Amino acid sequence: MIMKHTFLVKEWFGAFLSLLFPRCCVVCGRPLAKGEECICAVCNMDLPRTDYHLRRDNPVELLFWGKFPLERATSFFYYRKGSDFRRILHLLKYGGQKEIGAIMGRYMAVELIESGFFQGIDVIIPIPLHETKQRIRGYNQSEWIARGIAAVTGIPVDTEAVVRRKYTETQTRKSIFERWELSLIHISEPTRPRLIS
């Protein structure tokens, strides 16, 4: 009886807070329905997914082939200039809303797991920030996305397998592929090479 009462109080309190401080979709600004996180169902349906996980030799894989050992690579959605969906990454990266990374990581994992994308993957290694940027931001958005993926897949996250040795200025003027190349090939260095070979 006490548990039921506690549950009802939590539900009532949550509903009251929603009236005062409604949770809104980070893309369109509409109030989120019960069970929705971060983005509403309409925006989730309209999310410009790449579906690269369904294509061998996709642009992300091609970018990294021959540069380091790689089995599979993908990106969840397109980052297009002028798109409202850019808010997701902007709030995650610069808005202090690290939880968005975990939520989007879970969304991504739920979709990718059905395709077998994660089969044979032993560890998730988020691309690190330089320690200076980590201190400024307070968190690594890549790590939070990895945590969300791990929550669905059960694959462990290793935040110490790779370190960033070189500090770079903002990469906002570079294409996504130029950013990945800088991050993965020129700046980051494995601390345990056998783990990622």
Task: Go through each PLM region and give its residues.
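Short, ordered, surface-exposed loop/turn motifs in non-cytosolic proteins
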Residues: 195-197
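Glycine-rich phosphate/pyrophosphate-handling loop used in enzymes and phosphotransfer proteins
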Residues: 1-188, 192
